[in-house]
Design a protein with these regions (language model features):
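Q-loop/switch helix immediately C-terminal to the Walker
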Residues: 3, 8-25, 31
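Conserved ABC ATPase signature
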Residues: 48-57
Length: 131
């Protein structure tokens, strides 16, 4: 699933573990399970990505944000992070964002639905210049 950076031939858990290893992060199975739990995916950890709905795939991808809270990540660049998420997924995503901001992280995200976010933000309007 190139849209979310997930391998359809691996389980949700295996995807997260592989991604963490590729980053060079030393994470325990408990860390990975907490990451999945942060986006309400723990009960789906043994599902193959090919069996997941688009919303579950998005949640699986967003679980990586939780892992970045455990390391010295200072910046998140996110493109339409709430696409395919249901209301519960958006609430869980907001909690991750809020926690990251409280830890002095910076988030740059592209989104058409700013009303979905329940945290303080600075809006930058980047209009294209016409010649």
């Amino acid at each position: 699933d190139t849209k979310n950076g997930l391998s359809k031939d691996l389980t949700v858990f295996e995807n997260l573990k592989t991604w963490s290893e590729m980053k060079g992060w030393k994470t325990s199975d408990d860390d990975l399970q907490r990451a999945l739990d942060s986006v309400d995916m723990l009960n789906h950890k043994n599902l193959y990505v090919s069996q997941c709905s688009e919303g579950l795939k998005k949640r699986a991808a967003l679980s990586r944000l939780y892992l970045s809270l455990l390391f010295d990540v200072e910046f998140w660049l996110l493109d339409e992070p709430t696409n395919e998420l249901d209301q519960k997924g958006i609430i869980l995503f907001n909690k991750l964002i809020q926690r990251f901001l409280e830890n002095k992280g910076t988030v740059l995200l592209a989104c058409h639905e700013l009303k979905l976010f329940d945290f303080n933000y600075e809006l930058l309007n980047l209009d294209l210049l016409k010649r």
